[in-house]
Amino acid sequence: MKTASYLCLLLNVVFLGTASAADDSEARTYGSTDFDASGSPEAHEVFIRGLLQLHNFEYDDARASFLATQKLDQDFAMAYWGEALTHEHPLWNQHDPEASRAVLAKLGQTAEERAEKFPTVREKAYLQSIERLFGNGNQEERELRYSAALGEIHETYPDDLDAAAFYALSLLTISHGGRDFALYMRAGAIAEEILDINPRHPGALHYSIHSYDDPIHAPLGLRAANLYAQVAPSAVHALHMGSHIYFALGMWELGTERNTRAFEAAVARQSNPDDSYGSQANHALAWLIYALNQQGMHEQAAEKLALFEDQLSRYGGNTQRQNFIAARASYLVDSQDWDSHFATVPVDYDGLSHYFVATDQYIQGVLALESADVEGAKTALDAIDGAEPIQTRSRRAMVPRLLHLALAGQMALAAGNTREALALMEEAAELEASVPPEYGPAVPVQPTAELLADTYMSLGEYELARQNYELALQSSVGRQRSLTGLNGAAH
């Protein structure tokens, strides 16, 4: 084996070619890094592309690059390490350890056999880290062991910026059960140290944004948010990521711009325009709808929601159904357009998670109350479930409980039981405020403090309404309905 040492070179990696390494007239830019790995110089260049794509969460493209590296140099051991990691999407809660283990098996059937293929102590340490990640134990246990291994690599090789970046990502990953600010700030601090050395490192920019994408810490992420899309414009996810910070700060115009670019880029990259949208396009479109609604651009939001409706009618899979449910709920709550034809589109819940069923049944319950259908509202309330108290730090896990209380409160109000209604909504608002804020569009789709504030407004209790609109805005900065309500309460 030949060793290609690039320790003195910061590669501004601009490649000619598609993710499959075929020639193409379009230059692709994914950022810059410097990573020493054993193998031929030609294969090393393609490996670096895969590494940068991996930091950008362009997993399919990264896998193609790592496979192309192996084709150029079958002994390029780190290319197998990279390929194995393309099946692990930690922040998306998507895991395929069997696929990763199959990649490792290409190197050998045992950890000892595989280690023999990695020529340096440092490269062996990288292998050992994923042996922990894809070894025995449940997902959380393996993630903790993996993070510890990356921490050891980072400590042993402090000049290895990619080790630092992957360690930062692992700290975000092990925040199980909800956002742990201590872990997130540790990750952010590591990312900042990388950016001081290499301000064009895509992993540092990317993981910095994830570390800070809550309303409290978002100002710390503005540098990365503004720069990331410039550094890695060929990565669809990089085009989107800045909006994590913009949403947390209520910067809706920038959020609209970034998600428009990301959505259009994702669709343009589809080999067949008639194929269903991929995850990147779906994600950007959902966020775009929310950003448009926060600017009062409900007609434009409806046009984008119609794209999800079209996907639902043409394909109807789990992905299409859950995307339509979430986007429809967001649109109806934010626009208050309860007479919209979107409200009547049927969706099959088979195979969908409790989160999406609860979200849609909440909407069905509100629609029933809008038409004075008490029995319909009761049916929806039962379908939401969430009747029992829950202890969790995760907003998403808490959603059924929050929406159960919110709908029950509205049902009590409709029945004239004002005291009961307020008690239920206050319980929901207090419960929601007890957990860290979520990034992106509002979770739950109806912020419960906003609902409580709306109720106080309807009762003429303007000071209590003001207090609760302000509470809602703490976790949903710049949210239009809360801002409008707050202005009304003040006057």
Language model segments and positions:
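Solenoid-like repeat scaffolds
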Residues: 70-72, 154-156, 195-197, 226-234, ...
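Amphipathic alpha-helical repeat scaffolds of TPR domains
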Residues: 40-49, 75-87, 115-137, 159-176, ...
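Inter-helical turn/loop elements of alpha-helical hairpins
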Residues: 58-64, 83-120, 128-141, 174-182, ...
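Short, charge-rich amphipathic alpha-helical segments embedded
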Residues: 64-97, 156-165, 201, 317-318, ...
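A conserved hydrophobic secondary-structure block that centers on an alpha-helix together
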Residues: 57-60, 136-239
